[in-house]
Amino acid sequence: MDKRIDYKLVLDTQTCPIEKSDKVSPFNMLTYDIGWLITDKQGRIYKTRSFVIYEIFIGEAEKMKSAYYADKVPKYWDDIRSGKRQLVRFATARRILLEDMREYNVNKIFAHNMFFDCNTLNKTARWITKKHYYFFPFDIELCDTLAMARDVIIPKATYKKFCIDNNYLDKRGKPRATAEILYRFISGDLDFAECHTGLEDTLIEKEIMAYCYKQHKKMRRILYKNNKKFIYEKA
């Protein structure tokens, strides 16, 4: 580890609903796939992890049938058999996350729409342990690449034109800010399709993060800075 580098961790989750609903709420979701990578401001990769959560993927097999990407379950099994992904307990995934953070002295964790990833992990922790309300340690910064992109990418005239030209607009006619569309803009690859698997999605999210830093502009970044700022599901 190079102590001169400010290492960062980029994380992504894939989830299944506890109760079937048309609304996508992190408080109704359980994490079955968590992937992360260690990177820096330039987007260089130093370590990757890909875990399938046993208690949800196996223990909640019926709920897995309602996952938005349930059709990927056979591919997950192929990846587990090949060693591409590891099937582990939730506590094991968290322990290894903390070990990686200590190894690289990480104090910032990024996700695209961190509100969702943070709270579905909190929900999963509560669901499995019946007592723990949180997943991340309290002494780190949770950062949101979606907020960063909204401040430094979406206002760009070139991005607005890109979205208009390719019909990447929401119902109000505003440019969309999905990780897939942002990456298409950054990379110039209009055929790019997001994998919607944990580790693979972090590969594009770290590019969004690096692109935002490269702009050297003021931007929102921190979602929750400490435990006093955490939002928990109301009882």
Where are these regions (language model features)?
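Conserved non-catalytic scaffold segment of RNase H-like nuclease domains
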Residues: 2-122
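Conserved protein kinase catalytic core
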Residues: 18-20, 150, 207
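Substrate-recognition/cap helix-loop segment adjacent to the acidic, metal-dependent catalytic center
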Residues: 115-143
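A short, structured active-site edge motif that brings together acidic residues
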Residues: 51-54, 135-153
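Short alpha-helix plus adjacent loop in nuclease-associated cores
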Residues: 143-170
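Short, polar/flexible loop-turn hinges at active-site or ligand-entry regions and domain interfaces
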Residues: 80-84, 131-136, 189-195
